[in-house]
């Protein structure tokens, strides 16, 4: 337990630097544990409920950390990753995240794994250093390219590197005209103006693929037992925030920010 308490104390001290306030709800009574100090004080169900309520605040914390890690960048990477809620054989009788039609899971296809799955898809933009700038969750059936409509309102004056799923001259023109974003993707060999993808861009794209692998292997982002969409989305947010927090601790300790398997205290 000594290591756990050491990690907890370190993370709590960093949170106090970002936000001196301890509680974020207007309560008539003084709570036994603040919204930050949760370890060993409350039951899991209470913790999950409080975490769902603090989803907006968690994202604010994450954005503050991102701004300290990478205030601005001239190059970003964009990609998506499938998130299953259940196996295909159980999809028709599954009741997970089925509160509303707008947020219910759907069937989708993942070209990288050559599989049809049932669930959601996470769209993410990260820097060349491997820091998640923005992300969103959509139904699995939503095409990757539609996330670019959100990106143009979040980024500007930069290069955006994606895979063939983002190949579209119309979106390229729209991004450049509206936000001065230069979208760069590999071209299909059947295109008239085909030219090989630059090795520099191909190498840069490996960073976001590595981040997704770390989220799967070390944070079990695909293992999610939430029953509601709010709970599902909050757990995804918490795991990405945990990764960003470790990167921030690494930066402060003089370590490589993407060396996630280290002692943080």
PLM regions: where:
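Short alpha-helical elements
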Residues: 1-265
